[in-house]
Curated annotation (Swiss-Prot):
GO terms for molecular function: translation elongation factor activity. SUPFAM superfamilies: Elongation factor Ts (EF-Ts), dimerisation domain, UBA-like. One of its GO terms (biological process) is mitochondrial translational elongation. Belongs to the EF-Ts family. Keywords: Elongation factor, Mitochondrion, Protein biosynthesis. The keyword Iron does not apply. This is Elongation factor Ts 2, mitochondrial. Associates with the EF-Tu.GDP complex and induces the exchange of GDP to GTP. It remains bound to the aminoacyl-tRNA.EF-Tu.GTP complex up to the GTP hydrolysis stage on the ribosome. The lineage of its organism: Eukaryota, Discoba, Euglenozoa, Kinetoplastea, Metakinetoplastina. The keyword Mitochondrion applies. It holds the Pfam family EF_TS. This protein may be expected to contain an N-terminal transit peptide but none has been predicted. One of its GO terms (cellular component) is mitochondrion.
Length: 278
């Protein structure tokens, strides 16, 4: 009888640990908190998830006033409709480099990407409104990240790529991120770039767009006319390289975490027709 009782106890313990494992996988909450939530709800996983969600929300409220000075920038391209760079912050560099934080950044990017595509780019016309909308849409993800990391996480800003008005047709957009860890588009420096195809019927290779964005990330601190700089890794100027690839530059945006954005916009041609006033 004693052996049977012990066997049942061991079986129950194994089953409980499996529930803890499942709950941790679904919520990413600490193991101890998962176990406590399951005990509180008498083994009801769904109710335990609600308990953890409420605790995470309460913890997030307490941590929102903490200063966030570390983090990552995220390149976000919404197809042909536009692009932006998002800055996501944490309290420590240790947290910013964690898989939890990096994956949260990726989910934030996905949320903005959907908004860009669904609105056909209209969401980016007002960066402050885009930021507010993104914060609202990702509130649950941010709260979950705060609960797991144990420190504050914020979406600091959304910087929009603005096209040159006179180079806004047949646009292709690319991105490049420097200092990435294991998650694409999340790193220390992010750049997005828009180019116009000289031949509208010709598709631009994704690798070509990446090359253009990488050049502007690499030369973001350089002074002078970007068109006369040597294109990254070549002997050609930027203007020559773009023309060689059937492209015309429209605009670029580069954000180095913690610094002011650097933008370039195609200058108006000197021989552009000026319409008389009145």
């Amino acid at each position: 009888m004693l052996c049977l009782t012990r066997l049942r106890a061991n079986v129950n313990k194994v089953a409980f640990m499996e529930m803890v494992k499942d709950l941790r996988f679904r919520t990413e909450a600490p193991i101890a908190e998962c176990g406590a939530a399951l005990k509180e709800t008498h083994g009801d996983v769904e109710k335990a998830m609600e308990v953890l969600r409420k605790k995470g929300a309460a913890r997030a409220m307490k941590k929102r006033s903490r200063v966030t000075e570390h983090g990552s920038v995220v390149a976000c391209v919404g197809g042909l409709f536009g692009a932006a760079v998002i800055t996501v912050c944490s309290e420590t560099d240790f947290a910013a480099r964690s898989a939890q934080f990096q994956n949260t950044c990726a989910r934030v990017k996905d949320a903005l990407q959907r908004k860009i595509i669904d609105s056909k780019g209209d969401v980016l016309t007002n960066p402050m409104e885009a930021h507010r909308s993104l914060v609202e849409a990702t509130a649950e993800d941010i709260r979950s990240s705060i609960a797991v990391l144990g420190e504050n996480v914020t979406i600091k800003s959304v910087e929009s790529l603005r096209l040159a008005p006179h180079v806004a047709e047949h646009i292709s957009i690319g991105s490049y991120t420097h200092g990435s860890l294991d998650v694409p588009d999340v790193g220390r420096i992010a750049g997005v770039v828009a180019v116009s195809r000289l031949d509208p019927t010709r598709e631009v290779q994704a690798s070509t767009l990446t090359d253009v964005a990488r050049h502007f990330v690499a030369s973001s601190g350089a002074e002078g006319n970007y068109a006369h700089q040597n294109f990254f890794g070549t002997e050609e100027t930027v203007g020559q390289w773009l023309k060689h690839h059937g492209l015309c530059f429209s605009s670029s945006l580069v954000v180095d975490f913690g610094k002011e954005p650097i933008t370039h916009t195609a200058s108006q041609p000197r021989n552009a027709v000026k319409h008389p006033e009145g």
